[in-house]
């Protein structure tokens, strides 16, 4: 008997795979408006500063395929097929949905490689996928909407922080900054849970790592007229130093799951500039990337959704 196929739609922001792709990528982010030459060269300069191109594309593919393999090892009566859908560069989310349809996939589970729910992020990804699937008559997509408090996600970061603290002599003079990508402030007034979820993640990790000196901050804000959520991690670093005279700063960009421009430049370069300026030590624990412990975390998240799908199918088949 043939195994039932399940589509595993893994969605992420995407990144250019070469410097030649940067302009098209940036134009897509700007809703079709080409960036000025100055803005384009600034972005290209940032990529060059981290080695020429971001490792994100390679890492995202590894995460998606390793997750799919893991799911197939657990749910042996099903066949999970991997589909990668990106927000701002090919393969786009819509490409992945159309490919599932062509492959005859009738049911799919979607996961966004970002832990915190926001109308700007996870909701937007899932809406794009579900909207098209409904227009073309399938597949039925079961979305995972958030996983900011997943125990294995929390324990990953707690362990990273504990490891980092072994390198610090005066632990009372160290502070952890948990961060995520800033978004326009207007989402808060609309009741978006994004900020509260980051705070909850930070509280859970801090408790698991047994640390008292920590706070949340925001990074990589867009250059638009609208105000974005703050404080920015660089400003926050200066403020914390002025108020507490911390000697060590540990940056945990928990809103991201892989090394990419926002971590390798915005944290490892820009935040380090500030810590050098105030003569403090800079630390940034390892990102989850495609480490087996993080793949186990993602597998746990998708498995919970898969069990819901199976239970739903049983109810429908028994009626």
From Swiss-Prot:
UniProt-annotated binding residues for Fe-coproporphyrin III: 13, 30, 46-47, 54, 125
Localization in the cell: Cytoplasm
GO biological process entries: heme biosynthetic process
Assigned EC number: 4.99.1.9
Any one Gene Ontology molecular-function term assigned to this protein's record: metal ion binding
Pathway: Porphyrin-containing compound metabolism; protoheme biosynthesis
Matching Pfam families: Ferrochelatase
InterPro entries, per database record: Ferrochelatase (IPR001015), Ferrochelatase_AS (IPR019772), Ferrochelatase_C (IPR033644), Ferrochelatase_N (IPR033659)
Swiss-Prot/TrEMBL catalytic activity: Fe-coproporphyrin III + 2 H(+) = coproporphyrin III + Fe(2+)
Gene3D superfamilies: 3.40.50.1400
One GO cellular component term: cytoplasm
Highest taxon listed in the record's lineage: Bacteria
Binding site for Fe(2+): 181, 262
Keywords per UniProt: Cytoplasm, Heme biosynthesis, Iron, Lyase, Metal-binding, Porphyrin biosynthesis
Secretion signal, residue range per the UniProt entry: none
NADP in keyword set: no
Keyword Cytoplasm found: yes
Functional summary from the UniProt entry: Involved in coproporphyrin-dependent heme b biosynthesis. Catalyzes the insertion of ferrous iron into coproporphyrin III to form Fe-coproporphyrin III.
Annotated family: Belongs to the ferrochelatase family.
Annotated PANTHER family: FERROCHELATASE (PTHR11108), FERROCHELATASE, MITOCHONDRIAL (PTHR11108:SF1)
HAMAP family the record matches: Ferrochelatase
Descriptive protein name: Coproporphyrin III ferrochelatase 2
Organism: Bacillus cereus (strain ATCC 10987 / NRS 248)
